């Protein structure tokens, strides 16, 4: 009888305890290869619940409540120092991170909400002096993404900077972190570009930047195309590998069939909007000679 009572109390405790963030994903830089990085990005994509597939591309859910809205990435540098990164699974946006017993969150409403569910045991919480969009981060970093190296060595440096929180270089480190995780999950091209640089860095191309700037637009038009005979309602202009503008008008384009790996739910696009980066402004005003 006592054993049954103990078992019942154990089961009750499991079901009534506070919900926790699940679906954690880990990546270690020590011994990392192109393959292990690819597995990490694959695991990240699989940690994001989706509503259905559109043209065989997972369409992220429009809304998830409570702790289920977030997953954690545990990233370890060459020196065996780990940061944990909180990601909103509905849009792959990074909310903040934990280093030791200190949590750091972006200065925005969505990150404030995330702090109610992640890193609650941190002894200290720091609100960063900027939000998580590209425009704000580039302003804080004093440079645009094209001038910030990527690659696994760059990710190692970013983790180290964030682990010790070097304020003067944190924004640049966060830009590296976002592109090495969220953007790689969104696009196979970006995953491949970063993953093949195991022991060296590179500067992202304008093609990479244009993909990052247009994830919302592509997601929206791909969803429209699924009920419009494969045609986009409005073209999405990207930059190709030759730094030329290309107009994407339908779901048969290669960026749809073999590149984009996740779709932002169109119910969230109006609320989130497209990040307006310095680079995009440069495109519009011809500052890059395109």
UniProtKB/Swiss-Prot annotation:
Keyword Hydrolase listed: yes
Species of the source: Bryonia dioica
Name of the protein in its database record: Ribosome-inactivating protein bryodin I
Catalytic activity: Endohydrolysis of the N-glycosidic bond at one specific adenosine on the 28S rRNA
Coiled coil residues, start to end: none
SUPFAM superfamilies membership: Ribosome inactivating proteins (RIP)
Post-translational modification: Appears to undergo proteolytic cleavage in the C-terminal to produce a shorter protein.
Family matches, as InterPro entries: Ribosome-inact_prot_sf (IPR036041), Ribosome_inactivat_1/2 (IPR017989), Ribosome_inactivat_prot (IPR001574), Ribosome_inactivat_prot_CS (IPR017988), Ribosome_inactivat_prot_sub1 (IPR016138), Ribosome_inactivat_prot_sub2 (IPR016139)
Leader sequence residues: 1-23
């Amino acid at each position: 009888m006592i054993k049954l009572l103990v078992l019942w109390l154990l089961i009750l405790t499991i079901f009534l305890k506070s919900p926790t963030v699940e679906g954690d994903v880990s990546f270690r830089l020590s011994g990392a290869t192109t393959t292990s990085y690819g597995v990490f990005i694959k695991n990240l994509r699989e940690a994001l619940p989706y509503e259905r597939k559109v043209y065989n591309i997972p369409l992220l859910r429009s809304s998830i409540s409570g702790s289920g809205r977030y997953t954690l990435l545990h990233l370890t540098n060459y020196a065996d120092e780990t940061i944990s990164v909180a990601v909103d699974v509905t849009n792959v946006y990074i909310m903040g991170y934990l280093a030791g017993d200190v949590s750091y969150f972006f200065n925005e409403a969505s990150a404030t909400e995330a702090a109610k569910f992640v890193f609650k045991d941190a002894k200290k919480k720091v609100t960063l002096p900027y939000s998580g969009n590209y425009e704000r981060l580039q302003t804080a970093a004093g440079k645009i993404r094209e001038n910030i190296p990527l690659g696994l060595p760059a990710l190692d440096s970013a983790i180290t900077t964030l682990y010790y929180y070097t304020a003067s270089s944190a924004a640049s480190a966060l830009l590296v972190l976002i592109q090495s995780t969220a953007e790689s999950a969104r696009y196979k091209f970006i995953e491949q570009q970063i993953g093949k640089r195991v022991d060296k860095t590179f500067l992202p191309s304008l093609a990479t930047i244009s993909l990052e700037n247009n994830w919302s637009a592509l997601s929206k038009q791909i969803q429209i195309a699924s009920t419009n005979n494969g045609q986009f309602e409005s073209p999405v202009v990207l930059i190709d590998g030759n730094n030329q503008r290309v107009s994407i008008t339908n779901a048969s384009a290669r960026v749809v069939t073999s590149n984009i790996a996740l779709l932002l739910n169109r119910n969230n696009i109006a609320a989130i909007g497209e990040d307006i980066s310095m680079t995009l402004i440069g495109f519009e005003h011809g500052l890059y000679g395109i």
